[in-house]
Amino acid sequence: MILPIIAYGDPVLKKKAKDIDKDYPKLEELINNMWDTMYNAYGVGLAAPQVGLPVRMFMIDPAPFADDEELDEAEKKVLMDLRKVFINPQIIEETGEEWAFSEGCLSIPEVREDVFRQPDITIEYHDENWEKHTETYSGLAARVIQHEYDHIEGILFTDKLSSLKKRLIKSKLANISKGKINVEYKMRFPNAKKAR
């Protein structure tokens, strides 16, 4: 089932999410619904807060980035094979010199800005079968994980922008929160005027 994606301005996107356990109600159904929702919106990642749930879970499938001609074959292969669910993740290390990449977000449609992040991460997490993993990622794979991880920390990519950039997109963000935007996927807007 396709769920509505929560738009910029909803408080759930600014809350630090809570861990879940194996008994979380209808977890398998939620995971399947989130995959459907992400693919329906042509996303490469989706975090539980983006569907209104302040829990520490996200999923990624960065395969569309593998079409980038500038990437080497090894990085393309990583991106093609990286369809994963991350439950209760913790980034335990971020290293390397920060680099910029134009990021977007399903909760903030039609806004893309350069965000600086470190290129290498080590992350601990449980998969959907509750197997524990500790893995290291680099480049675009790391960036997609960092972006989704920020969601469960209550951080949006717009929070990482300079004050000037924030001022330049302020009215665009206000319009998104009010639902004054056309999107091809289902969304829930926190400040939309209710019809009488």
Swiss-Prot record:
Catalytic site: 148
BP GO annotations: co-translational protein modification; translation
Cofactor mode of binding and number, as noted: Binds 1 Fe(2+) ion.
The UniProt record lists the keyword rRNA-binding: no
EC nos: 3.5.1.88
A Pfam family annotated for this UniProt entry: Pep_deformylase
Cystine residue pairs: none
Molecular-function annotations in GO: metal ion binding; peptide deformylase activity
Positions that bind Fe cation: 105, 147, 151
HAMAP family xrefs: Pep_deformylase (MF_00163)
Name the UniProt record assigns to this protein: Peptide deformylase
Organism, scientific name: Christiangramia forsetii (strain DSM 17595 / CGMCC 1.15422 / KT0803)
